[in-house]
Amino acid sequence: MKLESQFLSFLYSRGYCSQCTNISMLDQLMSQQCVHAYIGFDCTAKSLHVGSLIQVMILRHLQKFGHKPIILLGDGTTKIGDPSGKDKSRAMLSASEIEENALGIYEVLKKFIVFGDGPHDALLVRNAEWLNGLNYIEFLRDIGKHFSVNNMLTFDSVRLRLEREQNLSFLEFNYMLLQSYDFVELNRRYNCLLQIGGSDQWGNIVSGVELGRKLRLPELFGLTTNLLLTSSGEKMGKTAQGAVWLDGNMYSPVDYWQYFRNVKDEDVGRFLRLFTELSLNEIRNLELLQGHEINESKKILATEATRICHGEEIAQSVANDALKVFECNDDSGLSVFYVKKYDVELGLPIIKLLQMCEMEKSSSSARRLINDKGCKINDVVVLDMNYKLSLKDFYNTSYVKLSCGKKRHLKVMLESDF
């Protein structure tokens, strides 16, 4: 169908959307008025990572097309844990940990969208405002009566855990009710009509839409995004070294740029649509590049994604430094990792060094790297698993260049012992 709403047309043309409830009516509404829409994030970490970047970009586009983004921080629901897409229960967090995580997520989101009091400015809300004071008996009577356990057992978040005979606590089973109730409260308090989430949230979102109908609220809508997978079927946002955080203090802009520069050829066009603001015509032209030229598309993807997350100045600086390192053999822009001189004098095992500097996550992955001839010291391939970094490696130089594959490099420097 032809969409009238600029926002929905944009989302569908870029490949964001998976499913939507009553899309014809939602399209009509969004083409005629400013719609208040929300996306929720539980406070399980101090930052969001690339796995949440689709949702963050949608918030940015909502604002750009004249709608009002509402960000719901689940400081209340984090105390329970969402079972969607999870194989096991999450560890319980303390109130202080949840608060610290909420503040960190807010700082990340401020880089992507504008918060304020204007009609299209983003609004930050916490669901502890209404969940912490709930009376359990009243909640069961007024809200719980509208939910069928039979239906709840059919949703993937519940069904898959039960089929695998994995524990699903009663606490987690209640998460769907609380997320549905969040939608109702956001409508009552902030006139929110649309909830957006990942495809694994479809059951919870539809339950919220249905709860609104049973409580005779204005029609509510739900929209889910496609699951963010690479062409090889892996979830986005993780590397061998850990999560790709959107907080520059937890994952450096240099590494962020490199993450997108190193995506597979098959993913470049899709990621340009999802994670940059280049026009579709520009993206189509970049998709025409083949062979070695596709690296130019990857550099543009990396620089544009870094610009949105970390700012124009940092993105250009990182891109220029990368050009020096990888195309001009200039090591000046490499990150530095310090090792104690005493350890090097004794002989620092290469397996240990690779883990210390987080180039590899485990000794087994470090061994695989060496076995595949992917580890280099000063551009010389390391062939010996038992190789030890020594002072001889620092002869006539202030640093040792450590390389893992063609695209990961850093400078190892000596730190004086105190």
Swiss-Prot record:
Q: Does the keyword Zinc apply?
A: no
Any idea where the S4 RNA-binding domain is? 348-413
Give the subcellular location: Cytoplasm
PROSITE patterns the UniProt entry points to: S4
Q: Which residues bind L-tyrosine?
A: 38, 175, 179
Q: Which domain of life does this protein belong to?
A: Bacteria
Q: Does the keyword ATP-binding apply?
A: yes
Motif 'HIGH' region: positions: 43-52
Tell me one GO biological process term: tyrosyl-tRNA aminoacylation
Task: Report the EC number(s), separated by commas if there are several.
Answer: 6.1.1.1
The main enzyme category here is ligase
Q: Which UniProt keywords apply?
A: Aminoacyl-tRNA synthetase, ATP-binding, Cytoplasm, Ligase, Nucleotide-binding, Protein biosynthesis, RNA-binding
Q: Which PANTHER family match?
A: TYROSINE--TRNA LIGASE, MITOCHONDRIAL, TYROSYL-TRNA SYNTHETASE
Query: Subunit structure, briefly?
Result: Homodimer.
Record function comment: Catalyzes the attachment of tyrosine to tRNA(Tyr) in a two-step reaction: tyrosine is first activated by ATP to form Tyr-AMP and then transferred to the acceptor end of tRNA(Tyr).
Q: Provide the family line.
A: Belongs to the class-I aminoacyl-tRNA synthetase family. TyrS type 1 subfamily.
Protein name per Swiss-Prot or TrEMBL: Tyrosine--tRNA ligase
Which source organism? Ehrlichia chaffeensis (strain ATCC CRL-10679 / Arkansas)
